[in-house]
């Protein structure tokens, strides 16, 4: 911790924004099956809404198929309904206490809309990172104004903060480009 500004805390907060972005990207459905696709699905269970992975086990038995093993047989209908109503474009096939979910081929229009969603996630993450930078700059200016640090130290810390911001945003751009390539791959 330098007087007035904690660069480690700022780095931790920026890393948090990147981790949130990675998790958002993982939930986007590409051509391959991934258990993360079902992360946003909430199931009406026992009088409240819970995440699907708290009432079932999600597997990927084949590249274009998801398997959902529901622990409580009475929950099969609720899980099936939750997946169908999740706007993921998935239609589960009930097989006893399990669901099989074939992943349809993505058409060009759907691919482009997924890329737009990914760009939206990236922009939200960049905004969060800029907010962290702004908080750091405000702390820096306050410390300089209060006489805790000198002008040279303030300038040096400001440059470090800007470099951290630039590096973090370039990481987000790189992750976005990788995901975009993955989505558009036929």
Curated annotation (Swiss-Prot):
Family the UniProt entry places it in: Belongs to the RRF family.
GO CC aspect terms: cytosol
Domain of life: Bacteria
Keywords: Cytoplasm, Protein biosynthesis
Native organism: Allorhizobium ampelinum (strain ATCC BAA-846 / DSM 112012 / S4)
The protein's name in its UniProt record: Ribosome-recycling factor
Function according to Swiss-Prot or TrEMBL: Responsible for the release of ribosomes from messenger RNA at the termination of protein biosynthesis. May increase the efficiency of translation by recycling ribosomes from one round of translation to another.
Listed InterPro entries: Ribosome_recyc_fac, Ribosome_recyc_fac_dom, RRF_sf
Localization of this protein: Cytoplasm
CDD domains the UniProt entry points to: RRF (cd00520)
């Amino acid at each position: 911790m330098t007087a007035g500004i904690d660069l480690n805390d700022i780095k931790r907060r920026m890393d948090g924004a990147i981790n949130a972005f990675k998790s958002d990207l993982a939930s986007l459905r590409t051509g391959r099956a991934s258990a993360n696709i079902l992360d946003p699905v909430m199931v009406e269970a026992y009088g409240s809404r819970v995440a699907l992975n708290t009432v079932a086990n999600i597997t990927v038995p084949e590249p274009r198929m998801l398997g959902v093993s529901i622990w409580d047989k009475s929950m099969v209908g609720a899980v099936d309904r939750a997946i169908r109503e999740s706007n993921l474009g998935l239609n589960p096939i009930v097989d006893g206490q399990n669901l099989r979910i074939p992943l349809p081929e993505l058409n060009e229009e759907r691919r482009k809309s997924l890329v737009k969603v990914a760009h939206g996630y990236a922009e939200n993450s960049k905004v969060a990172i800029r907010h962290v930078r702004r908080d750091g700059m405000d702390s820096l200016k306050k410390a300089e104004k209060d006489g805790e640090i000198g002008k040279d130290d303030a300038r040096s810390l400001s440059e470090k903060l800007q470099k951290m911001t630039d590096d973090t945003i370039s990481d987000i751009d790189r992750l976005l480009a990788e995901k975009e390539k993955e989505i558009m791959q036929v």
